[in-house]
Amino acid sequence: MNSIHGHYHIQLSNYSAGENLQSATLTEGVIGAHRVKVETALSHSNLQKKLSATIKHNQSGRSMLDRKLTSDGKANQRSSFTFSMIMYRMIHFVLSTRVPAVRESVANYGGNINFKFAQTKGAFLHKIIKHSDTASGVCEALCAHWIRSHAQGQSLFDQLYVGGRKGKFQIDTLYSIKQLQIDGCKADVDQDEVTLDWFKKNGISERMIERHCLLRPVDVTGTTESEGLDQLLNAILDTHGIGYGYKKIHLSGQMSAHAIAAYVNEKSGVTFFDPNFGEFHFSDKEKFRKWFTNSFWGNSMYHYPLGVGQRFRVLTFDSKEV
């Protein structure tokens, strides 16, 4: 399966800063099943003003960090402004409109919201949009950090925010999340292998089961478009007779890819994390299955083939702390 570099891979025309552009046209932007055609004619001076405002928005403002440098002296990662940052901001905005519907549905199926988090808006988006390799989203890195934190009996959000409340970021955690995503986006690098290596360094290992007299990692792939959600949910909820397991779930479609995560426990239920919507808990697997099938899949817009509604891959992990 292709590596997950963010939400969407989009081809944009390259414009040099010195060109005398009379118009800029974004055509056939596809977000989920929504086809958006934006044609905007701008004078050269007006274009300069808009670009200047966008660059200023992405490069200035209150830091909202607990300190300027990490504990080992590294600065928060940034890169030069690119036009793709504008496109990604538009996509994040559309995805953020689905947040209320997803969160409001949780209680209807007997679930609870543990933490309201969304990488598609607010201060967190402001931090990731400043680097070209994180502007599209850091779902893979967020899921990896969420699994590690949960396995350690901690909350990712206590580690990400000062005092566990939105407002000020702990730069060490923010830097670590962004760097893992950046490392996975490098040329000639397999992002899955980068994440696996990071897991190993942090006490997380792939679950191995015996097949044909050999130990192999639990790695389930399939399609959601033609086979529905049963195969995907079975892979997420299967604990292989052990009673628990961490799941890193890759979803992909024609234009995009996304990562979500879960901790499944036969006794305590399912804790589910989606970087676009937050962390939720369901007291048993059946409640989670019904919510995912009847509400979440549609409300999130993940069911569209143009989005992430075609293929899946579910990996199962264990931790020394569990």
Curated annotation (Swiss-Prot):
Name of one Pfam family that matches: Peptidase_C58
Effect after changing residue 258 to A: Loss of function; abolishes the cleavage of ARHA
Active site: 139, 258, 274
Alphabetical keyword list: Hydrolase, Plasmid, Protease, Secreted, Thiol protease, Virulence
GO BP terms, alphabetized: proteolysis; symbiont-mediated perturbation of host actin cytoskeleton via filamentous actin depolymerization
GO molecular function, one term: cysteine-type endopeptidase activity
Keyword Protease: yes
InterPro entries linked: Papain-like_cys_pep_sf, Peptidase_C58, Peptidase_C58_Yopt
Phenotype when changing residue 139 to S: Loss of function; abolishes the cleavage of ARHA
Compartments, as annotated in UniProt: Secreted
Its EC number(s): 3.4.22.-
GO cellular component terms, semicolon-separated: extracellular region
Class of the enzyme per the UniProt entry, highest EC level: hydrolase
Family the UniProt entry places it in: Belongs to the peptidase C58 family.
Complex formation: Interacts with human ARHA.
Role, per record: Cysteine protease, which is translocated into infected cells and plays a central role in pathogenesis by cleaving the C-terminus end of the human small GTPase RhoA/ARHA, a regulator of cytoskeleton. Once cleaved, ARHA loses its lipid modification, and is released from the cell membrane, leading to the subsequent disruption of actin cytoskeleton of the host cell.
Protein name: Cysteine protease YopT
